[in-house]
Amino acid sequence: MDDIYKAAVEQLTEEQKNEFKAAFDIFVLGAEDGCISTKELGKVMRMLGQNPTPEELQEMIDEVDEDGSGTVDFDEFLVMMVRCMKDDSKGKSEEELSDLFRMFDKNADGYIDLDELKIMLQATGETITEDDIEELMKDGDKNNDGRIDYDEFLEFMKGVE
C-alpha cells in the first residue's frame, strides 16, 4: 500500500474519521473479524458519497487486500477513502479553476491581461493597491509576455490556498 495515502489518512479530521468509521461499522456488525467483505465495500463507499465503478472498486480492493482474504479492515478502508477523496478533488478543482479563469478572462481571448486582473481583484472588495496587482501579474506571467495564459494561471493557483 502507498505510504503517501497512509500519511494522508493522518491528515483526516476527527469528524471525517468518525463519519467513515460509522459507515464502516454498519457493515461490520455481523462480522466476527471486524472486516467488511469486498462486495459490501461498494455500498459503504456510495453511502459516503463516493461512486467508484466496479473496475475502480476491484482495483482498490486488489491494492489493499494484501492477504487475499476478500475482506478489508478499517485501516485499509481509510486508505481507500483518502484515495477516492483525492481523485474527486482533483477533477473538481481543475473544473473550478477553469471556470475561474473564464471569469477573469473578460474578453475570452484565452489570456488574462493586467486590466482584467485589476477588474476581478477590485470586484472582490478587498483593498488592493496598483503595486499589489502588478506584483500578482508578474508572479503569474511566467513567460513575461504581459498576460497570463491558462497554464500560467493553473501554475499560479497551485500556490494559492
Swiss-Prot record:
Binding-site residues for Ca(2+) 1, renumbered to this chain: D65, D67, S69, T71, E76
CDD domains xrefs: EFh
Chain segments annotated as coiled-coil in the UniProt record: none
MF terms (GO), sorted A to Z: actin filament binding; calcium ion binding; calcium-dependent protein binding; protein homodimerization activity; troponin I binding; troponin T binding
Residue sites binding Ca(2+) 2 per the record: D105, N107, D109, Y111, E116
UniProt keywords, alphabetically: Acetylation, Calcium, Cardiomyopathy, Disease variant, Metal-binding, Muscle protein, Phosphoprotein, Repeat
Gene Ontology CC: one annotated term: troponin complex
PTM annotation (N-acetylmethionine): residues: M1
Pfam families found in the cross-reference section: EF-hand_7, EF-hand_8
Listed result of changing E134D: In CMH13; no changes in calcium sensitivity of the myofilaments
Residue positions, PTM Phosphoserine: S98
Miscellaneous: Cardiac muscle Tn-C can bind 3 calcium ions per molecule. Domain I does not bind calcium.
Similarity field: Belongs to the troponin C family.
Entry function: Troponin is the central regulatory protein of striated muscle contraction. Tn consists of three components: Tn-I which is the inhibitor of actomyosin ATPase, Tn-T which contains the binding site for tropomyosin and Tn-C. The binding of calcium to Tn-C abolishes the inhibitory action of Tn on actin filaments.
Clinical condition linked: Cardiomyopathy, dilated, 1Z: A disorder characterized by ventricular dilation and impaired systolic function, resulting in congestive heart failure and arrhythmia. Patients are at risk of premature death.
Protein's recorded name: Troponin C, slow skeletal and cardiac muscles
Organism field: Homo sapiens (Human)
